[in-house]
Amino acid sequence: MCRDEPDTMILTQIEAKEACDWLRVTGFPQYAQLYEDLLFPIDIALVKREHDFLDRDAIEALCRRLNTLNKCAVMKLEISPHRKRSEDSDEEEPCAISGKWTFQRDSKRWSRLEEFDVFSPKQDPIPGSPDNSRLQSATSRESMLTDLSEHQEVSSIRSLSSTSSSAPTHVPHSGEATTPRTNSVISVCSSSHFVGNEDSFSSLPSPKELSSFSFSMKGHEKNTKSKTRSLLKRMESLKLKGSHHSKHKAPSKLGLIISAPILQEGMDEEKLKQLNCVEISALNGNHINVPMVRKRSVSNSTQTSSSSSQSETSSAVSTPSPVTRTRSLSTCNKRVGMYLEGFDPFSQSAFNNVTEQNYKNRESYPEDTVFYIPEDHKPGTFPKALSNGSFCPSGNSSVNWRTGSFHGPGHLSLRRENSSDSPKELKRRNSSSSVSSRMSIYDNVPGSILYSSSGELADLENEDIFPELDDILYHVKGMQRIVNQWSEKFSDEGDSDSALDSVSPCPSSPKQIHLDVDHDRRTPSDLDSTGNSLNEPEEPTDIPERRDSGVGASLTRCNRHRLRWHSFQSSHRPSLNSVSLQINCQSVAQMNLLQKYSLLKLTALLEKYTPSNKHGFSWAVPKFMKRIKVPDYKDRSVFGVPLTVNVQRSGQPLPQSIQQAMRYLRNHCLDQVGLFRKSGVKSRIQALRQMNESAEDYVNYEGQSAYDVADMLKQYFRDLPEPLMTNKLSETFLQIYQYVPKDQRLQAIKAAIMLLPDENREVLQTLLYFLSHVTAAVKENQMTPTNLAVCLAPSLFHLNTLKRENSSPRVMQRKQSLGKPDQKDLNENLAATQGLAHMIAECKKLFQVPEEMSRCRNSYTEQELKPLTLEALGHLSNDQPADYRHFLQDCVDGLFKEVKEKFKGWVSYPTSEQAELSYKKVSEGPPLRLWRATIEVPAAPEEILKRLLKEQHLWDVDLLDSKVIEILDSQTEIYQYVQNSMAPHPARDYVVLRTWRTNLPRGACALLFTSVDHDRAPVAGVRVNVLLSRYLIEPCGSGKSKLTYMCRADLRGHMPEWYTKSFGHLCAAEVVKIRDSFSNQSTESKDTRSR
């Protein structure tokens, strides 16, 4: 057995590393730091008490990881310290969900705000010990880790069968010398009796059990340092032997033989009672073998409609540790390091409950519904009619609902729901195999051709599979034919060419398909919270004349025209009570905390309900934040351009022409029957694509067919380099609708949405709100959420598509049209349809802060970081008396200090704009970089300052309104301006204290402003917090000036990663627009003189 010890140690180290990574990204970084500093084991009961605001699932997910680390600490296993990120990326902002911990930025340590013993379980005084001292708790003024390093003593268990185990433990006084590095954990290092099988971790005693043991320190005559040195040498020798053995051992011809349990020497009856050992023979023949329990089916964790009470038992016995999902070991390895709360492994009732639950799950699997498809159905198209029923095997036959196969003697009955007739039985063609008629009801799904067991095509045309449907189908086809003739009469062009091979018609009746979605029947008045008409005319849109130079970046830089869609914004304006709960109103620190909580919640739900091999840690936050080389998209403007590139170019994730297409459909085409279902014309759709690529600023859709525009919109999402839900998270979205129960899907999908990148989440919100308007007109267009989902889900999830360039490994090669569709593909298509329909129906609830965040003590509300008042700004200055003028003067001095030091410490950053871009990390405040953009402008400093102060509308295309609230002096004022956002997201509201200077050395000018809280400024949108904004204008000769713009702002509703990837590009684009405003003005003046 000893030869397996190195492998076991390596696997345990991997498990500990993954547990620490999970703790960091879910808001528990303090525990990962404690483990790396060898301050484990900790008392899990006290951790539960500290996080009592979390629900049961989240607590179990946390305790599983802590229990794993406790066992690893007992085994004296260390992991490599957490590596810092590269210099060009921000370190992750320290963030803990619990409000009882604080991060000391000077020492980079976590410490507690109040005394709380978290490291050792409470225990009775040990008899014979000279002192009853316990671990001291750290306060907010000193690091807890340093405090523990000075007072905690080490104990080493060399062997559980040591003859000195009955000696009393000596707890040293606080004055006794201890070794800081080795005084952290109790280690188990048995040299000869260590069992190296895969389940050896779970047999280790817990921290509470260790407290009942007593260990001898063999007197005080032996030096502590010598003991520590010998212990480290022993550990190092074990590591060297293990690594050498793992590299050179020959493969064994015989399988690993594990003997029966061997009672160690010295294990008397008292110890057996402490370990809860039970005699197997005492079970009276009714026992259940432990290996059978470990090999049992995981069906109890995969059911999709089980109640919460039933699933609790399932999760308690079937949730593995993270590392077991990433390696392929024997089935008995699936319970390594799991946390079982209130579960007695030797309880007979526990085994009986598990067996009974598995039997119930096998007997009544909920997903036994099938859809009947007519025999003249054309593969690849939507059937004319569908009816649902269920398979009922007759006799002794059994059905495997996971794979769709069934086995048994010769007959299979098809029972129709709500049918009073006796079921008709049909003989199968072969008793050894089944032929399943599985036709897809989604576009993009190739038609399936069934094969018999011999590999030949099954002749189903001569076999009457659905005789009961003949009469019904006859009438349905006749009515469908009448509807088609009526719709063709009113269509603009009778061309039957399909624009896309994947576009297929779906039933026009809202009740014809039931895909397990609760339809939310909404009227237009329900969607419009402000009383505005959904189809109210927009303000007239003038096409501005292009004024750029026609060369360089001005040809590829987007959008001098902004779409202003006020009716769409006002129809989804939240009520006053729910404004603070909207995601787009949260600060960057709150978004960071909310993302960690969402990952915690999603992990808990997926581990509870999904099979062990269906989920993992690959979709966690650091994975999709990994920096990837992005290809160049200079030759593309709309189609095939990532959403991130759109943000960097124009400040909005959706191109203007795509937004205009959505507005055209919403204002003029909601009454078109079968919108997004009926196909457009290929030639016209191709012409629309060319119009979008050539003139992305503005595209006139007047007179275009609604079906052509809708198909073009579907093509836009299909042509994105990755799905809207991203490659990393698409599978998670599908798993939610495959395994998570209905009553918990909403909170699971809200958590998954919070893990999306900001631009993907904003586009998803815009699209879902738009589709909710389409379903509001269901009486006219007959498009329910389910019908829309059938048509759009393949495009949004990129289902059933061939692997493309730059796509992730998840997009696998799909089967060709002549092959049999894979069961996984069918399950994913069904889950995607159900998921999209559910998100359309519940779109108003998906983008709100969970109510659970209000229970995070004060850690969430404290992160709001509102702008300060004038009086509070005055207190930031060191001068007395406190006044905002002193604060402004300090800002001016800081600006010229940067100039004097020639901007030392700034890091250059690449950008596509014709400007120099750099950044500087700031340790204070929220996790936001300070960005700097520099450009040369063909104007004098005074002219540029006037353009910035009085003529913002000439260069800011997003400006909606601006006004001066209060004039404080000749060079200082309170200024408010509002910028437009992509509909239906609310506008951005700025209220700033700004001051300017013109009498600076060398003829320079400066404009400085920062956000301020002013009672006379009305709220006109989401209030932005500008922490720092500076304009420095220096003359550089020949009538030109050097414009330097520095900014650090919290725009609300964005993650720290968004500011790292996109905000700097927006700063560079702003100075380019200021320069272009002067270039265009000079060009116009020359044209006027030439005339």
Swiss-Prot record:
Primary localisation category: cytoplasm
Domain SAM residues, every copy: 11-78
Phosphoserine: modified positions: S86, S89, S129, S321
Any single biological process term in GO: focal adhesion assembly
Stretches with biased composition (Polar residues): 130-143, 499-511, 526-535
Start and end residues of each stretch annotated as Focal adhesion-targeting (FAT): 274-447
UniProt cross-references to Pfam families, sorted A to Z: RhoGAP, SAM_2, START
Residue numbers spanned by region Polybasic cluster (PBR): 614-636
Low complexity biased stretches: 155-166, 298-324
Residue ranges annotated for the Rho-GAP domain, each copy included: 641-847
Recorded consequence of changing R677E: Loss of activity
Molecular function in Gene Ontology: GTPase activator activity; lipid binding; phospholipase binding; phospholipase C activator activity; SH2 domain binding; vinculin binding
Region: Disordered, residue numbers: 120-181, 296-329, 402-439, 491-552
Basic and acidic residues bias (residue ranges): 414-425, 513-525
Keyword flag Phosphoprotein: yes
Site (Arginine finger) residue list: R677
Matching InterPro entries: Rho_GTPase_activation_prot, RhoGAP_dom, SAM, SAM/pointed_sf, START-like_dom_sf, START_lipid-bd_dom
Keywords: Cell junction, Cytoplasm, GTPase activation, Membrane, Phosphoprotein, Tumor suppressor
GO (cellular component) term, any one: stress fiber
Function: Functions as a GTPase-activating protein for the small GTPases RHOA, RHOB, RHOC and CDC42, terminating their downstream signaling. This induces morphological changes and detachment through cytoskeletal reorganization, playing a critical role in biological processes such as cell migration and proliferation. Also functions in vivo as an activator of the phospholipase PLCD1. Active DLC1 increases cell migration velocity but reduces directionality.
Subunit structure: Interacts with EF1A1, facilitates EF1A1 distribution to the membrane periphery and ruffles upon growth factor stimulation and suppresses cell migration. Interacts with tensin TNS1 (via N-terminus); the interaction is decreased by phosphorylation of TNS1. Interacts with TNS3 and PTEN; in resting cells, interacts with TNS3 (via C2 tensin-type domain) but, following growth factor stimulation, TNS3 and PTEN are phosphorylated which leads to weakened interaction with TNS3 and enhanced interaction with PTEN.
Entry note about domains: The SAM domain mediates interaction with EF1A1, and functions as an autoinhibitory regulator of RhoGAP Activity. The polybasic cluster is required for activation and mediates binding to phosphatidylinositol-4,5-bisphosphate (PI(4,5)P(2)) containing membranes.
UniProt protein name: Rho GTPase-activating protein 7
